[in-house]
Amino acid sequence: MPIPGESLSCNKSNSCLYQVRYGDSSYSNGDLAVETFAFDSSTSNESVVFPKVVFGCGHNNDGTFNETGSGIVGLGGGAVSIVRQLETTIGGKFSYCLTTLDSKSSSKISFGPNAIVTGPNVSSTPIVQKSPDTFYYLTLEGVSVGNEALAYYIPNSNSKASVEEGNIIIDSGTTLTYIPSSLYEGLESTLEKSISGNRVSDPQGLFGLCYELPNNGEFNAPSIIAHFTGANVELTQENTFVEVEKGVVCLTFVPSEDLAIFGNLHQMNFLIGYDLENQKVGFLPTDCSKTQ
C-alpha cells in the first residue's frame, strides 16, 4: 500500500504528474491517466467494463517492480485505489488468494458480491477505523506457539491487560510481518526452545532467527497462531520460515518499532476477503493453487 505523502501536480495543458512511494522504499513517478478497464467475469463469458478509471503510467519506477508483472494494483483504502474507484459497483468487497512461493499457479483476486468469503471454517476480525485511511487496521491480541501464549501489550502501558485496537495493518504488498520487539523477543525465544536444528547467522542481516537446512531438506518448526480479535489464524511452517539462500531458512517475523504489519508470506494459502461495507476481514484456509 502507498504511504501517506504521495503528490500530484498538473499544468495548463491538463497533463498531470504523480509521485507515489511505498513502505518498502519502492516508488513510481509518471503521468496520471484515465482509461476503461475490463475484467473477466466469474458469472458469464462477457468482460465487466469500468470506464474512466484513474491510474498511473509510470516512467520512473524502482523497488518491487519487475518485468514479469504489468504493474501494481492499489487495494488500499485511499481515494485513488482501484477498490475506492469501483466501490459502488463492487459493494466494497474484494478477496484474494496468494499462492506459495514455489507454486506454479497464479494467485487470484476477485471483486464484488462473489468475493465474500463464507463457510464454517471462516474466521473474521473487525477493521478498525484509524488515520490514514490508506491502511486496513486490525487488532492483534497476541501469538501462540503450542501452549505458549504471548500477548501483544501496549508499550509503556500501566495495564498489562491492555491491547490497543488497530495495532497492526494487513498488507498484501509487504513481504514480511513486522511486530514490536517486546513481542518478537518472546516469540523467538519460544521457537528456539521448540526447534531442533543448527542455528546460524542471517546472511542478509535482516532476520533474527535462522537455521541451517539439513541435507535431506527436512526442517520442522511448530505452527504459530496469530490471535486477532475474533479470528485465530494458524500459520504453518510454509508461512513462517523461508529459505533466504541455499541451505538457510529464516523466521518471517521481524522486530520493528514502527508500524506493525501482517505481511503477505503469512497470508499465503488463505482466501482473504475484505468487506468494507461491514468493516471486517475474513480468513479461510485454502489451497490457493487450486482455487478457480
Q: What residue spans do the PLM features occupy?
A:
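Signature of the N-terminal lobe/flap region of pepsin-like aspartyl proteases
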Residues: 1-53, 59-61
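Short, solvent-exposed loop/turn segments enriched in Ser/Thr/Gly
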Residues: 30-34, 69, 164-165, 220
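Short beta-strand-centered segments at strand-helix junctions
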Residues: 71-82, 179, 261-264
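Extended, H/D-rich, highly charged conserved domains that either
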Residues: 77-80, 84-114
